[in-house]
Amino acid sequence: MKRILILTVVLLSGVYLASAQSTRYTAFEPASVWNDTDGNIINAHGGGVIFVKNKYYWFGEKRGRGASEGVNVYSSPDLLNWKFERLALATDTVNAQSDIARGCIMERPKVIYNDKTGQYVMWFHLELKGQGYKAARAGVAVSENVTGPFRFINSFRPNGHMSRDMTLFKDDNGDAYHIYSSRENYDLRISKLSDDYLFPTSKDTLLFSNHREAPAIFKHKKNYYLITSGCTGWDPNKASLHIADNLFGPWKNLGDPMIGPNSELTFGGQSTYVLPVQGKKGAFIFMADKWNPRNLIDSRYIWLPVSVNDGKVEIRWRERWDLKAMKDSK
């Protein structure tokens, strides 16, 4: 009887695991649990996506129980079903003097490819171990492979400025830019990066000073669009959209692009990235995090289509949607 019972349990467990591993998503369900192809919850918060050789790669914060554990990377051919690749950048568990020693805070990682050096370059917001949010630094790491492992290079305050929430943007001509919150989050700044993308240049300017963070930028035709959030800690707030025909400004405030229930609180989320969809003209996905400060691993993801029509941007709430619903922007 025991053998039969054990065999039954093993068989049932195998069926359950196979079911979890074979789950395939056919649509986006914003703010719902989102598992990877192994059946584990996706752990890639505050992240961004890069497209390489017919695959998307999603980099994001690996969150432990109250601690940063580095940067995870996942891959997908369809933006729905994500395979865990590896821990792309780990905290340093050997050298306690390292800027990324275990216990540090690593947030909002973004990766871009440098065509001149052949390296993938990662920037992230870094806070040093034991200092809370006082350090306000930018961290940089590189890899020859998109999935890593990434080698930590350095951390610093760009041109002497505090650097917290941030994103990277690579323009059509290959120039790259670092957009970051500064001066205790009162300022939002932009700096052009060096040719190797490893350092900021002296071309660094203030975009605006109205307490904005969580920058997410995209380009459509000749205009740049910048989505930001207010500064209310882990709590959601109202988004704003700015437009400019030059990255260094001037930027014009177009108001809140969110439409639908709870839109005044960005549907309960906070912006992190705007993803260009390959194969669709002017199609973008707005990426946001719905933070759960009591258990950051369980923070959810809100991905929604971005509509751009004659310069007007709308991000409308949808309970469920797929890429077929996306139309080319005008």
Predicted regions and their residues:
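Carbohydrate-active catalytic/glycan-binding domains of CAZyme proteins
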Residues: 20-330
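Bacterial Sec-dependent N-terminal signal peptides
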Residues: 1-22
